[in-house]
Curated annotation (Swiss-Prot):
GO terms for molecular function: ATP binding; dTMP kinase activity. NCBIfam families: DTMP_kinase. Gene3D superfamilies: P-loop containing nucleotide triphosphate hydrolases. Phosphorylation of dTMP to form dTDP in both de novo and salvage pathways of dTTP synthesis. It comes from Streptococcus pyogenes serotype M1. The gene is tmk. This is Thymidylate kinase. The keyword Chloroplast does not apply. One of its GO terms (biological process) is dTTP biosynthetic process. It comes from the Bacteria. The keyword Kinase applies. Keywords: ATP-binding, Kinase, Nucleotide biosynthesis, Nucleotide-binding, Transferase. Its EC number is 2.7.4.9. Transmembrane segments: none annotated. ATP binds at G11, P12, D13, G14, A15, G16, K17, T18.
């Protein structure tokens, strides 16, 4: 039985969501006694990390969009049963850096795959599990890509090599999801100073936990 809460973190490339999450968690631990788990997709467990390597390898430019989607779904399922569900059943607060919405935005809006097919696969992989809250960090594609190019410590992956048009479609996909699920998905302006973005994210998380 699930007694914990699931919060997902989403955003186009360069939105800074991972950095925000790194700063958010220590602040949250000062305010709540609940055990907190942070993890990521694709990855989080050994099998899913191996799948991540396949997906992001810059040499795999021939990867078909449906192959890409199915790899993400496989990684999601293994991660869920091995790590996420046990934590939720133990009453933990779980943060996932990317989850079901990424598939709809990237493989749906970005790659042009049928949204209904992606939603069915998400349902199949998660047994219908949905986040209690999704923090969507929004940033224009031009700014996001400029941040990526300016970050010399970041390892370039296959998705970073995509055209700006695909990144723009991904962002539109996210914005459409936010309109479709206004109670679950909170849109946060990620062009603001980092401290302000973290503060807004913290407010939304505390509102969920203290409701």
């Amino acid at each position: 039985m699930i007694t914990g809460k699931l919060i997902t973190v989403e955003g186009p490339d360069g939105a800074g969501k991972t950095t925000v999450l790194e700063q958010l968690i220590p602040l949250l631990k000062q305010k709540v006694a609940q055990d907190i788990l942070t993890t990521r997709e694709p990855g989080g467990v050994a099998i899913s990390e191996h799948i991540r390597e396949l997906i992001l390898d810059i040499n795999h430019t021939a990867m078909d969009p449906k192959t890409e989607l199915l790899l993400y779904i496989a990684a999601r399922r293994q991660h869920l049963v091995e790590k996420v569900l046990p934590a939720l059943e133990a009453g933990q607060l779980v943060f996932i850096d990317r989850f079901i919405d990424s598939s709809v935005a990237y493989q749906g809006a970005g790659r042009g795959l049928i949204k209904a097919d992606i939603q069915w696969l998400n349902e199949f992989a998660t047994d219908g599990l949905e986040p209690d809250l999704t923090l969507y960090f929004d940033v224009p594609s031009e700014i996001g890509l400029a941040r990526i190019n300016a970050n010399q410590q970041r390892e370039v992956n296959r998705l970073d090599l995509e055209t700006i048009e695909i990144h723009q479609r991904v962002r539109k996909g996210y914005l459409a999801l936010a309109k479709e699920h206004p109670k679950r998905i909170v849109t946060i302006d990620a062009t603001k100073p980092l401290k302000e973005v973290v503060s807004v994210a913290l407010e939304h998380v505390l509102a969920l936990l203290l409701a």
